[in-house]
Amino acid sequence: MQKIFLGRSIAERIDPDYERHGTTGIIASRNVATGEIVHPLIQPTRKEEDYLAHIDGVVSLHATHRHVFINDNLNNVFMKTLNTHKSESLVRFIAGIEGIDQSTLGVKDKSGILKNMKSRAEFLSDKSHQIVFVYTPKHCSWLNQIECWFSIITRRLLNKRSSFISLEELVMKISDFIHYYNQFLKKPFKWNYKGNLLRV
């Protein structure tokens, strides 16, 4: 959308007609201890291999640490219709890290751990693994801290008053915001709900 500045003492107006220059996606993780956005991928696709590249990038930063990735049951706000968080390639990646023989995983859509999304999710949620995926219940995306951060970037950068002249500018602004956030704004979220029942 193009902002129209009319001069002194006249309210800003936004032209309802706009030209769309393209879209992009963000795949990111948040370090809950520091608040840092870790290994963000800003690209037009959100495929299985993209999500796996993100997970691999996060894990390779601290290969000896235990990693917990939280995903909502719909996968992610940006990935609701995709199965990227329970994919065959992700199961094989985790099995490789855990030293599990690939031949014991079964065949996708037929047998073993790879039989269906439920069996893959159970494997990825195994708490004995060095990398664990937690799938929150439906309507609990507020528990997923990266979803809270997506709300921050939406309010501060990607709101309805935002205007970008090209896809390249959008990607640059998102990247700049992440860099600025990590440098000056990062901090752990402080949860303050006490667990008391709400009263009407």
Predicted features by range, described:
Residues 1-200:
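Short functional hotspots at interaction and active-site rims
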